[in-house]
Amino acid sequence: MNSPSDLAGASLIDALFGVKLSQHARLITIASSQDSALPQALVAERFTGREAVNELFSFDVDALSTSTDLDLTSFIGEELTITLLQPDGSRRAWHGLCTDAAWLGADGGLARYRLHLQPALALLGLRRDSYIFQDKDARDLIGELLADYPQVRHSFDVAQALAVRPIWTQYRESDLEFLQRVLAAEGLSWRFEHDQEGDEPAEGGAAQARHRIVFFDSQAALPATPGGDTLRFHGVRASDTDDAIDRFAAQRRVAANAVSISSWDPAQLMAPSAEQLTSLDIGEMPSLSIYDGSAERRHDNKAFADAHSRVMLQALELDNKQFEGAGAVRRMAAGHGFTLTQHDSYADGDNSFKTLWVEHEARNNLEPALGEALSRLTGLAEAGAATLLQFSDE
């Protein structure tokens, strides 16, 4: 027998939506990336997410349904798409594999589920192996490693020469840990890009994800922030036609500022070496050098030693000066560049930045009546939308 609260909740939902919950004209939507039907009609209530350079993205989506017993296994491994309405009326999409699905409770005929989305690259963290790769550079090694994961799309934007190594050793570590170690050793970074409406479908068809990982080096030109590379420093108002950053502040840290490396090569009876000293303004700090001579046959010649020492120094310099901000910018993307305008402290020529990480928070624009019902039936408090950002100008 239904309780009075169940009947009241069902009546309210029917009055607001009819038979099914609707995603029509919502700020946030959720759907299957491959056009397969979800188990039941779902409405995205809210989501939080983080995407960063050299990091797996992660999104948690709270979704509502009139069904209280959805089969959670039907979500696992499914690629889902979140879209967020932009100021110009277009939609920005993120695609991720559902790696965790949970039922959070139900009351009054309305159930809440939480879906955790990650990139297909997260699958590499689930396989552990020991393996020897011979006579390969990093690009060839990565291609061989990812060949075992047809879901993972990848591309390279690398101009620097990559040394062919006689042996790469994966030892009792996951494929993801090994991949990250190889990339770090070569000074390569990575970011994710998501297919948007109108993009050509992936060549691999439905077997491949609708997001891809891009491996890039320090010489690569970062793409502009989606929707335009100019962002305003301005108060956030509901009547504005574009989003804005309303908090932006610099921070500096003490860090090592020099690198010295060498690597013994018994075939040449010598140790190719290199040194690098930062050219950044580090205040009154003395030279603080990191020396690394641990690896054998790491560099065939001084040119490769110089290149390796440069990327090591660039990694140290990244922490020298960064910026953090917040606002209501719905199009921020990690690994993309932008120009900040209307800020008194950053004039033209000194206002270009690269986004290192961004945290998203958004809640759907549900009707006031349903918002009150959710607060009453499930104890939710009202929350706004915000974005936390981190940038670098180096």
Q: Can you annotate each of these PLM segments?
A:
Residues 1-394:
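Amphipathic alpha-helical and helix-coil boundary elements used as assembly
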